[in-house]
Amino acid sequence: MSSQPLTLQAMMAAILNFWSEQGCIIHQGYDLEVGAGTFNPATFLQSLGPEPFRTAYIEPSRRPQDGRYGQHPNRLQKYHQLQVILKPVPENFLSLYLESLKVIGLNLVDHDIRFVHDDWENPTIGAWGLGWEVWLNGMEITQLTYFQAVGSKPLDAISGEITYGVERIAMYLQKKNSVYDVMWNGSLTYGDITQYAEQAWSQYNFETANTTMWLKHFDDFSAEALATLDQGLPLPAYDFVIKASHAFNMLDSRGVISVTERTRYIAKIRQLARAAADKYVAWRESLGFPLLKTPPSTPTVTPKKIPTICQPEDFLLEIGSEELPATFVPTGIQQLESLAKKLLADHGIAYKHLEVLGTPRRLALCIEGLSHVTIRPESEKKGPPLSLLFMTDGSVSPQGEQFFPSHGLSISHRSALDQPSAICRVRSINGTDYLFLVIPEERKETAAILVNELPQLIRSIRFPQKMTWDNGGVEYARPIRWLVALYGDQILPISLGFVSSGNTSWGHRQLDNRQLTIPSSNMYVDTLRSACVIVSQKERRAIIKQGLQNLTGDQIVAIAPEHLVDETVFLTEHPFVISAQFDPAFCSLPKELLIAEMIQHQRYFPTQNMQGEITNRFLIVCDNSPTDSIVEGNEKALAPRLTDGNFLFKQDLLTPLSSFVEKLKSVTYFESLGSLADKTSRLKLHLEEAYALLPLCAKEDIDTAIHYCKADLVSSVVNEFPELQGIMGRYYLQNASLSRAAALAIGEHLQHITLGSNISTTGALLSILDRIDNLLSCFILGLLPTSSHDPYALRRQSLEILTLLYTTQSSVDIEDLFARLIRHFPSSIPNTVWSPEEVLSKLNTFVWGRLRTILSSLGFDKEIIATVLTDNCPKNPLTIIQSAQSIQELKNTQILKTIAATHNRLKKILASLSFSVTEQMFSLQSAEDLLFKQALDRFVEETTALPISSKDYLHLLKELAQSTELFLDSVRVASDDESTRNQRIALLIAAQKCFGFYAWDVL
């Protein structure tokens, strides 16, 4: 970076001049309020159709909701985007962008520049694309996008969009902590020119804007857009689309648009934008697309000779691309490995070892000892019996006349088969002669197979999203820029779109950005290492883990969730771990908020002391050699994030909780079931019904917890960090000096619950009721999970309900609980036909399936689980789990063996008898009958107050089993006397019921 940083206007002029030299038209910002440079017709309209176009311009952008009254260091309601559109996008798109940074004084070697996954979308105008946020030492400075659709229309030619955040770049260049301190020119700051306007417009946007007027504006502008389109004027019509969009943004900032209404407004603007796009393309086509001077090129492939490989060799396929999203690389690794193994297996190609390596810029298939040929030995295929192919006189039968030509055989008589043949032969099986076709040995060169199959293999790699970047007909996660295909030291000629394979790869984009010649496939890893690329993801992970450990110690530990470690592994090709600091004053913010800001927004590793308190040190995984500029830049990048978090948190603390609760009325839970306020009211009814069954905590605490449990959903912090819902509610209740137990419960009720979770009793009850309401809601609305899709996490929530009932030792009939709580839902729901009986039947079946999972996770084997989970078992999860525990402890003892044997004997005897006993009318005559009846009565009396899950119950059941065996050994059940026979059958039926809670026959 130069010693004298550029002023804001000099910097913008330098970038515009750079792009002017690249053939761009230098437009001015549009003369309407737009939310982003994409709205400018030079982008929105010019991206449509096949006509090439290059432009650059500075767009003043209005986002009313982003206003911070001129107090935030870089959050503004009006800011500037320097927009570049390159259509069609050139192959050196990223290189051109990096060159443009040099003209403003950035020495790329000194900085950590990242291309971070960003799938951009503007649903308001039906535009989306794939690309990146560009980070300069942790600060997002640019957005790069390959447009895929605009105006809800797939594009004829792909445009590359570059959106510079000029204020942020200027802050970095001038080393300013606030945008308002940036020098606009040599004498005036950004604040001198804009800060008062930011204050005034924030007040207007949030407090005083006339919503009635803006609502009317939206309707008027929408109507005028349609009317103008009807007149065949797409350019004026699109202006009114822009105006309608700004009216919507104003209404949104005033908070007068509910979630449901917001969706409707966006859909309306998107429809208008689509109509304008259609009219525009039709208009340009009617003019003959005047800017289209030459037709687009198509790929041409010149066949190249496939090399001859004479022995097994190592093989390398490297797919070199622009930076893949970090979460896509593991997917690509897995896909490439499975596809390659299948390809080799399908063709019978032998190899020693196969591995796939991956970095942001490459996926590499490395195969050790790949056989140079695949040989399929001669084989035979059984055909029809000769009796079907020939007549008795040896002539060919009608069936034979069809069979022989269809298999390329010229046979006119049975005698032709008497001569030795290389194509067919006769074999006798069990006295019947059959014709066997001979499939000759087949030898194929592996190189030829790979040349033919690898292009399709690459196309078959499935990513969460794919894109196109030219008219080469290839889709991939990001543009493919090179291919390496080496079999030993020989190049396999592979073509994919406009890209052909070779033996040249590329080094690290910043540390050693040069083209590399790979001498042979077995030198791939070392050659890449020489250019500062650590291609092995395992090695990069080890470096990061060790770096995190080295920079902490006995008193401080890194907060390093595995998903963040994974992401940093695949954000880097040569990782370095460095330490930085932020202002200790921010440590007073909620720990979870600080962690979210650092991990989610910045991919930093926070640290905490041994007491679990957050510290002001954080760790950075960068992809360039550490410098003071990188450390300082990341510290400056985090400061605004923490400032914004502090601003949002303080704003929430100043808002009464009652105001949050009131706002829940305008937040939709499920459209057919009303708002979150309606859900909260339903939870209160659930509590009144369930508290007697689940008296886990003080009533006043759970009352408070339910009243406020959803309040933080409308808070500023949770709007920015949805994953902090519940957690922030705890802080807001504490700030309001409400019940500590209620505050803790709210903080706990959305956390994932496992058998090892530590949760308060109030939190447990709130969690149970909230999850039951979610289950009932989804089952009533028919939103059931499928085998592969569970968008509302109903499986997890049902597991958590059962886990909480077990860990709190809550004994309750869960089917009865569901039946009680379902009464709190309206019997008539819009667009939904439902019956409580049908819903409860499906829900009960679903939940019992999850109880089986709980039992398995507790270590019970399949036989125990099948024994306790029966149609006759109690509908009490705790009882069932305790029963499994008791049976597990007594497994393999004589007690259970006796019970099981007697149960099975009873079952077999009763199944063998024909009877119709409807009442137990006992007038017992024999001593054996009377003695057995006394044993049955004694068992019922002694177990009346005894849980069936207890071992004492099982001991008593064993005693009954012994009495039953004695009875069966002493009498003839099928007595000739009908009365005696019926009485004894009735006794056995009564005994069987005593055994009937469990499926003893599976033990």
Curated annotation (Swiss-Prot):
SUPFAM superfamilies: Class II aaRS and biotin synthetases. Signal peptide: none annotated. Pfam families: DALR_1, tRNA-synt_2e, tRNA_synt_2f. It is found in: Cytoplasm. It is an enzyme of class 6 (ligase). GO terms for biological process: arginyl-tRNA aminoacylation; glycyl-tRNA aminoacylation. Residues 1-310 are annotated as: Glycine--tRNA ligase alpha subunit. Its EC number is 6.1.1.14. One of its GO terms (cellular component) is cytosol. One of its GO terms (molecular function) is ATP binding. HAMAP family: Gly_tRNA_synth_alpha (MF_00254), Gly_tRNA_synth_beta (MF_00255). This is Glycine--tRNA ligase.
